[in-house]
Amino acid sequence: MADKPKTPKLDATKTHVAKEIKIGTPLISCRFEPKGRFVFAGAQDFHVWRWEPATGKKVQLKGADAWVRAIAFSPDGKTMLTGGFDGRLLWWPVSGDDGDKPARAIDAHHGWIKAVAVSPDGTLIATSGNDRLIKIWNFADGKLVRTLTGHESPVYNIAFHPNGGQLASSDLKCNIFDWEIATGKLARKLKAEEMHSYDKTFKADIGGARSMLFNADGAQLAIGGITKVTNAFAGVGNPAVVMLDWKTGKNLIQHLAKATFRGVAWGIALAPDGMVVAGAGGSSGGQIYFWKPDGKNEFHKLKMKDTCRDLHLAPDLTHFVTAHYDGHLRISKMTAKAKS
């Protein structure tokens, strides 16, 4: 039996943009599908785009008809789920062999679907939205299993625990709820206070988990967003990532930008060695931050050509894709450039 290929050693300080493609309209989300062949992106032209980096081919998928921020996949990589600002949940064939239109569409929420997640075993779908609800759906037939209530503000993000038995949800005020999937029971409430602010001048809340995921063993929950907000109306604040101990709910560390940067950590990734990566964007432009597990401030950062609005780690864990306001998808490798 042949040995499995070794994963190249990562060196964040050598991170470089290796490939990019112009979609041509501002992008708001991006995801690698589980096999790493395609990248999908939600765009402000009301479409979802599929890009195959190996060939450079891009395809505009028909049928979203909305801004799509929420993208998820079945574990086998055959089906993509998207949620848009119109409240519709869509099932798509990933490869395009069965067409480039949704295979199924349901009216899932009143208003914007903020997040979509698929259970580790691929049998359930979770969605959350501006209607303050979380809904659990049967993956196979799209039927509603149950609705989870309790949040008092829009539910920005959700994540299934790797054990498949729990679901984490976080709202605008960064209240974090731990749900039992089998019963729908709310097991406990946590909070990441640093990721929420109230602007007395504009009488507005700002914050929430703009990105959220568990690490591989489920011991920690990473939450990306904005902190130290000085103007809620203009969204002026600094990007941050909070790491919570999932068992105790304790805030382990808050990763911050060393220098002033006005923006939000829209997308985050966790490397196998615990390194935290965040794609930040705002009025200061676009920046990729790299933190060591115990580092308050980044040990490296990479300036991007334009505002970064999402980031997702590739299945091989050596590179990531970012979506940008200038309409480009960019793939960056966390290894040294190959010698020519």
Predicted regions and their residues:
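WD40-repeat beta-propeller superdomains and closely related acidic/aromatic-rich repeat-like regions
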Residues: 1-340
